[in-house]
Amino acid sequence: SLLKCSKLDIYLRFEEPLDSRQLSVLRSWIKRRVKNNEPLQYITGSCEFYGRRYTVNSKVLIPRQETERLIDIVIEKSIMIEKPDIIDVGTGSGCIASTLALEISKANVFGIDISLDALKIAEENKARLNVKNVFFYEMNILIDTPFQTYDFLISNPPYVSQNEMNNLSKEIKDFEPHIALTDFD
């Protein structure tokens, strides 16, 4: 996002110096990273997931590479269903829902979350990636009943206990949304 070019362009233009604006931005990013341990993905505002670039900010969890395995499993299992209906509970940035919608073009994918801020990021990613078959809704799965039945329910729910929160690295506990990490038990 700093250079506004592809990875290949970086290699091809490796010897090209940064202009004063780029250098200033880079210095501010380095300060944020070194001084605060702020995750690079939040500093740049994006991350890669399943080969695609997704917008992220401190309102959504940074997608983990391990989560890509969930995508692989659903893709593998969905082969037996002509038009699968899939729900992603706690969709956050929408990376799981949007990826499934793009990888399984005949699927209808629904992403739900209790955070309107997260849903804004999910919608932004949907629009930028031009995903037509994913739909995002504000919903608390513990209170509200989903509107239909689904062939697949996928989720990367909060899984860190309140006691474990203190043991997390500074860049996780100080920057990632606690609502996405813990159920506060």
Place the predicted regions along the sequence by residue.
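Mobile active-site "lid"/loop adjacent to the S-adenosyl-L-methionine
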Residues: 159-185
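Conserved beta-strand termini and adjacent loop/short-helix elements that scaffold enzyme active sites
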Residues: 45, 57, 137-139, 184
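Conserved SAM/SAH cofactor-binding pocket of Class I
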Residues: 66-167
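Proline-centered helix-kink/hinge sites
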Residues: 39, 63, 157-158, 177
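Cytosolic-biased juxtamembrane loops and peripheral soluble domains of multi-pass membrane proteins
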Residues: 46, 51, 114, 168-174
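Conserved beta-strand segments that form the floor/walls of ligand-binding pockets within enzyme
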Residues: 55, 99, 113, 173, ...
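Conserved AdoMet
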Residues: 2-76
